[in-house]
Amino acid sequence: MSRLENFLDEQNRLTAFPAKRRVKLQALCYLAQKFEPGKIYTEKQVNVLLNQWHTFENPATLRRELYQHRFLGRQPSGAAYWLEPQQPTLEELQRKYG
């Protein structure tokens, strides 16, 4: 994840959400690793967790991207989130999105 390192501070928090798709996908893979398998999270808990791992104060964008790329599942109401048991790999995402 060498390109992603350019977006991490000394505490390994994302300092910006990368614009280039390849690095953005690396960032999503990185953030997905912070969630505990089998645990159900409220939206607020997801935001708190994401806020611990980025500095640009936009958990909604990160949460939405994690959901859209199928790292996180959620109830239709958005009341509960979880780490999907089958995570997409970086290679799968890069093939899909180029």
Model-derived features with residue positions:
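Short alpha-helical segments that sit at the start of domains
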Residues: 2-37
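Short amphipathic alpha-helical segments
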Residues: 23-24, 42, 58
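Short helix-capping/hinge SLiMs at alpha-helix to coil transitions
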Residues: 35-39, 55-56
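Short acidic, hydrophobic short linear motifs in intrinsically disordered regions
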Residues: 37-50
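Short amphipathic alpha-helical interaction segments
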Residues: 53-65
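A short, conserved structural fragment
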Residues: 68-78
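Minor-groove-contacting beta-hairpin "wing" of winged helix-turn-helix DNA-binding domains
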Residues: 79-84
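Short, amphipathic alpha-helical interaction segments positioned at domain boundaries
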Residues: 89-98
